Amino acid sequence: MIRNPRLRNREQANNRHLIDPYPVHTLKRVDQPTTRINEAEVFRQHEQTSGFYRAGRGDFGEHMQQEYRRFVPKYPLSGAMVSMAGALADLVDEPVGMGAAGMPDSAVPKNMSWAPMGQVAEKKAPFTDNPEKMARHIKETAYFLRADLVGICELPVYAIYSHQKQDGKPIHLNHKYAIAILIDQDWHTSRQTSGNDWISNSMSFLAYSTSGFIACMLADYIRRLGYPARAHHAMNYQVAVPPILLWAGLGEMCRIGDIVLNPFLGPRFKAAIVTTDLPLAIDKPIDFGLQDFCAKCKKCATECPSGSISDKDKVMYHGYEKWPVDVDKCTKMRIGNKQGSGCGVCIKVCPWNKPNTLFHRSISWTMRKLPFARRFGVWGDDLLGYGKPDYNHKWWLDLETINGDLQVPNSSKNR
């Protein structure tokens, strides 16, 4: 059995002469996202309004501010991942030497020519004037770099943040296209975790750091082809990710707050974006019945340990029709979790969080095509025991950094 499903999926896709490792060609394409968006009411948001930034600023009190500073590095594996992701922060578009990325200048071989990350080639490369061919090529390149799913859209103006999070300066981004890169958080681990134990943050930062790594390389590659490009990842965004995922055909908005759910990965992924002026053919939004499914399911709302997710109907909020979520409660739970590192219970229990097996592909197809089957899908999910942790194959160590020392937490399942 191939442990890495991406490799298996790519092999199957190549045998069918398809680009994508999942059967995205079977999805229903529509002209508009299934989430109603009133563009007249949507405004460009300041990234400093995010729950995590406000926690770090002290808006939720001194204790939460202190926990914000340690909620990722308090677990050694997620700490290592965020350290690596932090090295990518300056590699999005600005000219940066290797030393600034964390590698001492003395470690760079003298016989190698390291082009500045932000430099755009003076001449446009051959073959880059055909949008259809370049879209296919860019997707294939992203998959070669180990992406799990890729989509392309025109960059919505309202997806661009108004100001930088770091210094509050206005953002001026005029790229035409956005390339979205999804990375699976690993079904093998997701099956075993409770969703809010000690591996939770590491699953997130596995996908954050990997998608960011790919985005930085892809953006640099596009610049070498003669077109401006910027990577956007967890350590350095200039765009909001959800609207881009909607327009790039990578999912629909779900009940879990501002999360986009993919029909093949469920909510079990993180994304990075590359914006560019390279001419690209775009994808269209998709409709796989998720709005109807989430209206009936409500499992994430029932299981949410902080009560952040609503079981009520949708509301219009900042121009989007969406299910409401209490961002403050969610942020406090993820940062202040005393039983683990972070929280992803909503991802864990979601009926769309499944492996890519023939059985589960069949169930997914049925729920996409037959509305009456969706309620039975939720019932069957509970009947088969999905959403519960399987510690029989648990591989990670339960450890917590307290005052600089690694200790076994009281909530450890290692005992």
For each feature predicted by the language model, list its residue ranges.
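Non-catalytic, usually N-terminal nucleic-acid engagement modules in DNA/RNA processing proteins
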Residues: M1-S190, G195-D197
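Flanking helices and flexible, charged tails adjoining ferredoxin-like Fe-S electron-transfer domains
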Residues: I2-Q32, K312-R415
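Low-complexity, intrinsically disordered regions enriched in charged/polar residues
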Residues: Y75, V82, I244, H360, ...
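Intrinsic-disorder/low-complexity, polar/charged segments
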Residues: N130, M134, S209, F213-I214, ...
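Catalytic cores of enzyme domains
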Residues: K139, F144-N356, H360-M367
